């Protein structure tokens, strides 16, 4: 009964944040996205080094390496630390959230990315006509948000650190013109929600 009450409370809080996020995303989509994207498109000298250092392939490869290292450590030593276990699961949650976002949500919403918009594509939703190269929601922010959300749920002391890191990541997405502001906000919300939900489940599993 206590668990159900806690879950109901979490859902109510999440619903409030969902409505707030939807309002902010809608405003950004209509009023902010295009001017900001066009402004940063003119500082294209910043995009190349950012693309090289923070491409999704690089991040996914790093997370896969962490998972493999943890598995090998478990096989070699017979056990791993709680932190190591948390790190590996956070990486797995992050990768799963990224796959769902890129292959389901981006296809569903079909918003052209900033580069396509600059070259003539409209900044509109094209439902069920998207691809993994579409823009909404941001895969990078889903990737980072899911990892951060999982950690923040299990290690409350890390909340401030990850909030700062997510803000930095959001800034890099804008400066690099990878995504519109609405993409970033939606991706951060969805990713963090997925991470916190997974963290809730993992905490309940670990408490047994």
What is the meaning of each model-derived region?
Residues 75-79, 107-115, 178, 182, ...:
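Transmembrane helix-loop junctions in multipass membrane proteins, especially transporters and channels
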Residues 1-69, 106-128:
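N-terminal transmembrane-helix/juxtamembrane module of multi-pass inner/ER membrane proteins
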Residues 65-77, 144-152:
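Hydrophobic, aromatic-rich transmembrane alpha-helices
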Residues 3-16, 122-208:
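Membrane-embedded catalytic cores of phosphoryl/pyrophosphoryl-handling enzymes
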Residues 5-9, 44-48, 52, 74, ...:
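Membrane-helix interfacial "entry" motifs
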Residues 69-103:
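Interfacial segments of alpha-helical transmembrane regions
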Residues 22-29, 94-100, 166-178:
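Aromatic-anchored segments of alpha-helical transmembrane domains
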Residues 27, 33-36, 66, 96, ...:
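Alpha-helical membrane-inserting segments
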